[in-house]
């Protein structure tokens, strides 16, 4: 192994953990942020052409996932059914609250999704490791940049590799290539005209795509930070059996189909009757 997305609400808060002498170098990302605009490709007008530039057969895999979801199934969206962490890049779409914690050597991205999903972005100048276990969040190396030369960092550039596969780009089921060689490059920066707007431009390079794919997430700052917990297991009424997922009735505890025409599972070892 080499190198190893719908509008949601996002909360981002920055805590600066460093000496007073160095604190002024970092941008002010304090406060709470929520997603306002999500553009699949800001270089193109809204409409056709915004979809992922998928090769065959990955386009067909994506279409099958969306068709299954339209029929009531999960498609390739397994996070809610199987409590699989979102990981990268989905974590940065941020359906759930996130907090940025800056240190001179590492930027931590703490997410309330799955209660405790932590992403580490190493900013200590390290090289890529010769080998790294694949992770849901991947392995990220970042660099702070002072673009306007005023002595304060403006942009955080990040490259992420070593992401676990199989992996999808968003809840619609846009698939990554199974070779695990995807690379995601990000640029995070405040809007120059409005410091209460934060941009996150993500470019994905993957062998399931015909070309590098740029998407942009835009967040708005809110004055107060509200942090809650998200637990996938609690009150989850989805039961996965084999490659199918069903719902568990809260009234009588029996399995129910999730989509029209869904066949019942083999329950011969249980007392539940099959129709």
Model-predicted segments: where are they?
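N-terminal secretory signal peptides that target proteins for export/translocation
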Residues: 1-4
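Bacterial N-terminal signal peptides
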Residues: 8-19
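Hydrophobic small-molecule pocket/channel-lining residues, especially in calycin-type beta-barrels
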Residues: 21-275
């Amino acid at each position: 192994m080499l190198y190893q997305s719908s509008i949601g609400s996002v909360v981002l808060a920055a805590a600066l953990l460093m000496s007073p002498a160095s604190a002024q170098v970092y941008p002010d990302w304090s406060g709470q942020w929520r997603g306002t605009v999500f553009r699949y490709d800001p270089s193109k007008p809204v409409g056709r052409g915004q979809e992922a530039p998928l090769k065959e057969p990955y386009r067909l895999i994506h279409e099958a996932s969306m068709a299954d979801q339209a029929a009531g199934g999960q498609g390739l969206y397994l996070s809610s059914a199987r409590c699989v962490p979102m990981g990268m890049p989905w974590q940065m779409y941020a359906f759930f609250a996130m907090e940025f914690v800056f240190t001179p050597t590492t930027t931590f991205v703490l997410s309330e999704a799955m209660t405790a999903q932590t992403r580490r972005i190493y900013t200590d100048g390290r090289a890529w490791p010769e080998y790294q276990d694949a992770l849901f969040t991947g392995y990220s190396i970042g660099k702070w940049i002072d673009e306007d030369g005023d002595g304060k960092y403006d942009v955080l550039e990040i490259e992420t590799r070593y992401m676990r596969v199989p992996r999808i780009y968003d809840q619609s089921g846009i698939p990554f290539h199974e070779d695990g060689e995807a690379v995601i490059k990000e640029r995070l920066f405040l809007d120059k005209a409005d410091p209460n707007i934060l941009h996150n431009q993500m470019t994905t390079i993957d062998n399931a795509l015909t070309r590098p794919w740029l998407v942009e997430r835009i967040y708005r700052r809110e004055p107060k930070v509200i942090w809650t917990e998200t637990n996938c297991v609690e009150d989850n009424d989805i039961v996965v059996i084999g490659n199918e997922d069903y719902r568990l009735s809260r009234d009588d505890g029996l399995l129910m189909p999730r989509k029209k025409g869904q066949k019942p599972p083999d329950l011969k070892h249980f007392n539940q009757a099959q129709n």
